[in-house]
Amino acid sequence: MSNVRSKICGITRLEDALAAVEAGADAIGFVFYAKSPRAVDVRQARAIIAELPPFVTTVGLFVNASRCELNEILEVVPLDLLQFHGDETPADCEGYHRPWIKALRVRPDDDLQAACKHYAGASGILLDAYVPGVPGGTGESFDWSLIPQCLSKPIILAGGLSADNVAEAIRQVRPYAVDVSGGVEQRKGIKDAAKIEAFMRAVRQA
């Protein structure tokens, strides 16, 4: 049985958040990036979070947001963790009085050990597929063999995961956590409770 943590990202509806919690997800993610079909506004996110039970980590995903924009969101939405998915420097990620993770889009020549050292203040590193011009949420997977063993940061594996491949991903990569969005959707922004349950079952059984 796996004790790998899980995050269901791209939540836009309360029923989807509650389905994720019911299935056993450790965290749910809200996308604060207007170009994403899964984007939410502060009122949506705050209303959903207000209905969550305790011990569910709420994560805000940002792509090159200004410090002013991010602070305005944090004044309204009680997020536990920040996820930076753009070209942010370590300095861009600091100073919000919350733990944060940095997403990296993996390419064959990337030095992931060096990236972990570069983002020394991160609580973890999220590894996603590289698709030119798209910061994430593509539904594409990548070659997991590109991930070195024993990276210096907890690894959150993302990119094209679903109930069909997450168990193999866990066996191969041995991540701290897995992150899914498109793999548990009816359509972009709308989750499928049965797919969430199947995904979480596969995670537990890995």
Swiss-Prot record:
Disulfide bonds: none annotated. Pathway: Amino-acid biosynthesis; L-tryptophan biosynthesis; L-tryptophan from chorismate: step 3/5. Keywords: Amino-acid biosynthesis, Aromatic amino acid biosynthesis, Isomerase, Tryptophan biosynthesis. Pfam families: PRAI. InterPro entries: Aldolase_TIM, PRAI_dom, RibuloseP-bd_barrel, TrpF_fam. One of its GO terms (molecular function) is phosphoribosylanthranilate isomerase activity. Gene3D superfamilies: Aldolase class I. It comes from the Bacteria. It catalyses: N-(5-phospho-beta-D-ribosyl)anthranilate = 1-(2-carboxyphenylamino)-1-deoxy-D-ribulose 5-phosphate. Its EC number is 5.3.1.24. One of its GO terms (biological process) is L-tryptophan biosynthetic process. The keyword Lipid biosynthesis does not apply. The keyword Isomerase applies. It is an enzyme of class 5 (isomerase). NCBIfam families: PRK01222.1-4, PRK01222.1-6. Belongs to the TrpF family. This is N-(5'-phosphoribosyl)anthranilate isomerase. The lineage of its organism: Bacteria, Pseudomonadati, Pseudomonadota, Gammaproteobacteria, Pseudomonadales.
